[in-house]
Amino acid sequence: MIYKSYFLENNINSLNEKITLFYGENLGLKNDLKGKIIYNNKNSEILRFTQEELTKNNRALINEIQNISLFEKSKIFFIENVNDKLLDLIQETESIISDRKIFLFADILDKKSKLRSYMEKSKNCACVPCYE
């Protein structure tokens, strides 16, 4: 599913997919959307990763998804600087993620990008292009 960024600026809660990819050159828009996600999920535990951290230890994300917290209702994951190298891990997590959400943030991804293509076609994933 592909969402228009201007639609989400006022309706960020309409993101129902488990995994959402924000990509493009408009860093300010991506940061605004990230802020709205955080604001609307105040009771959730927010965990942040970079792609570099996850490529060094790809079990870190899987372990955090499978950990059940007694104190927090849900978990939200932000993964920064993603590209095609993370596709295998995303596919693996898509099958085990339940009430958690993953938000991926990338720079410019061209149409040939495997990650972008997968996210656009998957039923559990969404894409949000962030261009000016």
Predicted regions and their residues:
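Non-catalytic interfacial helical region
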Residues: 1-20, 25-132
